[in-house]
Each structure stands twice: as C-alpha cells, then as structure tokens.
C-alpha cells in the first residue's frame, strides 16, 4: 500500500489527471488500459476496475481465492449497494479526485476492497470493465493459506470500519 500511495502522491505533485494502477507480477495486460480510460471518461466515473469475472475468461485464480473474492463481492454489495465483481483486482484507473484521496489516505495492507467501500461510501463512482488476466509471472502471492483467515478477518473489519466511518472525508 505504501508504494502505491507514493505513486498517487507523485501524481498529485505533478498534476496528473489520471493514474493507472497495475500489480507488478505480470498478471495485468496493459492492452486494457485504453478501454478502461475510455470508460472512465465516457461514463464520467471516478474509478474503473479491470474485472476478470465479468466475462469469466483468461486466468481465474485458485478456487480458495475465488471464494474469498466472492465473499468480498457480496460484502461490498451489502455495505454500498453496488456490485463489484472483482474487488481484489489491482488493475485500476483513477481520476484526479480519487488520485487526491489515495494520496492522502491509502491502506497499507490488502487495500483494494477497503478502498472500494471508502470510495462508494463517500459518493464516488466506480465502474468495471471486462479484462483478461494472466497467471502470475513473477513472485508469489502475499496471501498464503495460513494467512488467508487473518486476511479475511482484517479486510472484513477494514471494510466495515470504512463504511461506518463514512469513507473519505470530502
């Protein structure tokens, strides 16, 4: 989270109107960035998430991970009223308003679901576009089986607190 927040701070400092976020493990195909930016601009939304689950094509991750993703999808729907099919996706495009929010406040651990709840609770708009993701090319997931229970509890609590706390303070 800290490195991502530093990127958003750099974007604020240099006057960027848009920021693209990708994971560094080779999963995200850059060919979808143009479409995501187009949706951001045409639909006038604040953030676009690349979702591997809208069309269920390409790499889908492990069964256990998909169960966790499904749990977070349902929790986001309960907390915000909006369905987000791939809440753990790190492939995102943000507008200037979101860049400024993330530059000020960005979770350090497993931030994607929490930031979605914070944005939606604060009145920002989020859309998804279908993308194809590749299997991880480099490194290993930071979420091992032994850490998965801790991860689920920590992220669930962070999402609940984001909702109760009212999201980002405008």
Where are these regions (language model features)?
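Short, hydrophobic alpha-helix immediately C-terminal to the catalytic nucleophile
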Residues: 5, 116-117
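Acceptor/aglycone-binding surface of glycosyltransferases and processive sugar-polymer synthases
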Residues: 1-14, 18, 30-109, 136-157, ...
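Sparse recognition of residues in long alpha-helices and their boundaries
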Residues: 114, 168-169
């Amino acid at each position: 989270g800290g490195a991502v927040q530093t990127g958003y701070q750099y974007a604020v400092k240099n006057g960027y109107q848009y920021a693209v976020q990708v994971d560094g493990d080779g999963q995200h195909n850059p060919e979808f960035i143009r479409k995501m930016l187009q949706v951001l601009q045409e639909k006038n939304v604040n953030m676009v998430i690349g979702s591997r689950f809208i069309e269920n094509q390409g790499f889908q991750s492990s069964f256990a991970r998909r169960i966790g993703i499904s749990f977070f999808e349902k929790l986001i729907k309960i907390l915000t009223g909006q369905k987000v099919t791939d809440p753990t996706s790190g492939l995102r495009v943000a507008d200037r308003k979101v860049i400024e929010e993330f530059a000020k406040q960005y979770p350090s651990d497993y931030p994607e679901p929490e930031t979605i709840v914070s944005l939606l609770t604060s009145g920002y708009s989020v859309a998804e576009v279908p993308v194809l993701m590749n299997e991880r090319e480099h490194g290993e997931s930071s979420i091992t089986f032994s850490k998965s229970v801790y991860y689920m509890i920590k992220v669930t609590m962070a999402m609940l607190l984001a909702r109760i706390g009212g999201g980002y303070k405008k």
